């Protein structure tokens, strides 16, 4: 390979957005370079057939001794995530430090005088700990599965009632294993803030649980963009307007990549609105009920009649888990999707959830097993209203022309 190669190395890169981000920042072509083994990573650096690369899990610590010169901050942290080839000599940097500092600042997080719990002991742990330490944290605790080398176990960490800030540096909850969580945030009475360096999905289970409790919480997407902008400065040797670029690229990419999920009572028009909205947004439209029928080979009324509602909800939960892991979709959900607690978080992990509202007397009820109209429909609405409210990020009135409803949805998504 020529020394014009720019890209990302790591063991598994199927989750990466780095190519999209870097090609918005600068005019080089950025290549994803999965290297499954340490031997392959060492050989890659030894050949030096690249211009500049970013380094991700699990090679940030391995990369450091492969460099001829290492930036003092990266050396102090013990991890390198940016390597630039200048005339055959490799220069190592750590832009994760500035990226995480940007994330914290963007969400008003002040580490001064705080007790911080960092989950995980890998390369990113050292980076996060350095930012917290430099920010004046009173105490920095570490938790891991094993509790070795001075770390707490996750069970011990949950008993530390003085923890005020939690930062996850592990891959737990990352695509495709979304929905996983290492810590019960409800066990920490003084907890104020949760930051998660995982960026895919946009909101991990840990972040969603924190938001449910009214805490300041954010995933790692802004950190990803920030460290990429700072890395691009090393790649190109030119200063960039990072204060403008980082929020601009973060907004643009999240809007492009995010799902839009529609929930609401059966017959409120989710599928009709969703198909039209997807066309306007240039996203793929998916009807969750149709996907259930495709997978089971049965019509939904037949599933209810032959197997019961509990079986249907299991099929539905599997479909929702799969669909919401993906990106660039408009997803129309069945009316009862919010009855399953796991679904309510899954729906929110990769974008906004719009609650489509329509007067009960205008709901279509034909062919809907649990929605027959009259008193039963009113009782269903009463039961589900708080669940829709808890799951939704915005409400969308669908009581007029389709074009007006779609226009209102586009306004909500600005």
Regions found by a protein language model. Give the residues of each.
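NTP-dependent small-molecule kinase module
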Residues: 246-255, 276, 280, 386-414
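Glycine-rich adenosine-cofactor-binding loop
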Residues: 10, 92-97, 104, 109, ...
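NAD(P)-binding Rossmann-fold cofactor-contacting core
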Residues: 134-152, 289-296
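Phosphate/diphosphate ligand-binding glycine-rich loop within oxidoreductases
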Residues: 2-107, 201-203, 209, 213-216, ...
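Adenosine-phosphate binding glycine-rich loop
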Residues: 197-258, 398
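ATP-dependent small-molecule kinase phosphotransfer cores
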Residues: 290-348
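A glycine- and Lys/Arg-enriched "phosphate-lid" helix/loop adjacent to the NTP-binding pocket
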Residues: 349-387, 391-394
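Rossmann-like adenosine-cofactor binding region
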Residues: 150-218, 337-343
